Curated annotation (Swiss-Prot):
Protein name: Dihydrofolate synthase/folylpolyglutamate synthase
Domain of life per record: Bacteria
GN (gene name): folC
Ligase listed as a keyword: yes
Ligand binding (7,8-dihydropteroate): 114-117, 152-154
Length: 430
């Protein structure tokens, strides 16, 4: 029995990161031992290589503006560990986490002794989320974001009302597969019998895989790019604006506060999701709530301005496609500015290609490391770069010194490469 939050959290972090046996067997056993909390909630399930967090934020915000109470389970965290489980965007308390772990611990330890093996850290956190929304704090809807992939992700015991797949890109290829088709197959593993699926995936080969899986499960399928048009796109000083035509209606001058050309697509996909919820009488989201929700939606670490002198932006782009979209946005928004990039990445990411894309927008790059088991060495990143104006340090505190050196220079500082890295730097900046 834990009385201290830090002890409860340490117990979670002390668990295995990956299961000895892949699959959903342990999660299904945990759910059964807990009285099947996954069957007691009204949920939506969101998967995809990039755009998951922003799409969750958009859908949550629209539902909130329509008067609903919305829970979310997301990962990784950017500001606090507790934000993984939130209600209306507010993280649960230390006391609630401790109570959840105390209820979970005996079931986990009993499962340790079975043929299913030890539940992992992420499985336990996911089970805590199901338990929280089923018993501790009942809400109108819960949005679950997958952690990795889809088919065998621990969130995939959910019985959703709607499934969303944001995008398919090259990430976690050592686990999900080497081709776009293989990765799409893993993401499409969240499609359930008869449950509607909406997607913003663009690649024809990936769409074919998702469409086939939807047909196999008799799941109504809608593709953003098949049936909808985004037009009149414009970058605003503090967000994006676009118009959007679906099979149902035309939305003129939609605005978001999240910055980036890719956020228009995430917002459009969220509108498509809202249309489904309205059409199926699952929720009622008025046009006013939809528009207001998209403007009010916020998500930390997505081209987030965290300091003004000098301007410092944090962005969690952590794979090739994410960095490509980031570079595209920076070119569009800051064409006449000098940009200094601070970069770090995990060892298993294609950081050489990520660096190449950032070199197209950077005046200078400072390479850093951070305290994480899979973090790259700053020197390795430095050696992979061909830009002439570059520096490196293994000490994350030197990032703060690098930023301070830019005061009065009219340069923009962009910190990117890993969600874990920007979370670490965010704390140091505060």
């Amino acid at each position: 029995m834990f009385t201290a939050y830090q002890d409860a959290r340490s117990w979670i972090h002390g668990r295995l990161k990956f299961g000895v046996k892949p699959g959903l067997g342990r999660m299904k056993q945990l759910m059964a031992r807990l009285g099947h909390p996954e069957k007691k909630i009204r949920a939506f399930h969101v998967a995809g290589t990039n755009g998951k967090g922003s799409t969750v934020a958009f859908i949550r915000s629209m539902l909130q503006e329509a008067g609903y109470t919305v829970g979310t389970f997301t990962s990784p965290y950017i500001i606090t560990f507790n934000e993984r489980i939130s209600v209306n965007g507010i993280p649960i308390s230390d006391e609630e986490w401790t109570a959840l772990v105390n209820q979970m611990k005996p079931h986990v330890e009993a499962l340790d002794q079975t043929e299913y093996g030890q539940p992992t850290e992420f499985e336990i956190m996911t089970a805590c989320a199901f338990l929280y929304f089923a018993e501790f704090h009942k809400v109108d809807f819960v949005i679950f974001e997958t952690g990795l992939g889809g088919r065998f992700d621990s969130t995939n015991v959910v019985e959703p009302l709607l499934t969303v797949i944001t995008s398919i890109g090259h990430d976690h290829m050592n686990i999900l597969g080497n081709t776009i088709e293989e990765i799409a197959g893993e993401k499409a593993g969240i499609i359930k019998e008869g449950i509607p699926i909406v997607t913003a995936v663009t690649q024809p080969e990936a769409l074919q895989v998702i469409r086939h899986e939807a047909e196999r499960h008799a799941a109504p399928f809608q593709s953003l790019h098949d049936a909808c048009v985004i037009f009149n796109e414009e970058a605003l000083p503090a967000g994006e604006q676009f118009s959007f035509k679906t099979e149902e209606k035309c939305y003129e001058d939609i605005r978001t506060s999240l910055i980036g050309t890719h956020q228009r697509q995430n917002a459009a996909l969220s509108i498509l999701a809202a249309e489904w919820l309205n059409k199926e009488n699952i929720a009622h989201i008025s046009d006013e709530a939809l528009r207001s929700g998209l403007v009010k939606a916020a998500w930390p670490g997505r081209l987030e301005l965290v300091q003004e002198h000098p301007p410092v932006y944090l962005d969690g782009a952590h794979n090739e496609e994410g960095v490509e979209k980031l570079a595209e946005t920076m070119k569009q928004r800051f064409a006449n500015s000098r940009i200094s990039v601070v970069f770090s990445a995990l060892k298993d990411k294609p950081y050489q290609n990520m660096i190449k894309r950032l070199e197209t927008i950077a005046h200078a790059i400072h390479f850093a490391s951070f305290d994480f088991p899979r973090a790259s060495l700053a020197k390795d990143l430095y050696d992979a770069s061909e830009i002439s104006n570059k520096s490196w340090s293994e000490d994350p505190d030197d990032v703060i010194k690098f930023i301070e050196s830019k005061k009065g220079s009219n340069e923009i500082v962009l910190i990117t490469g890993s969600l874990y890295f920007i979370s670490d730097i965010r704390k140091r900046l505060k």
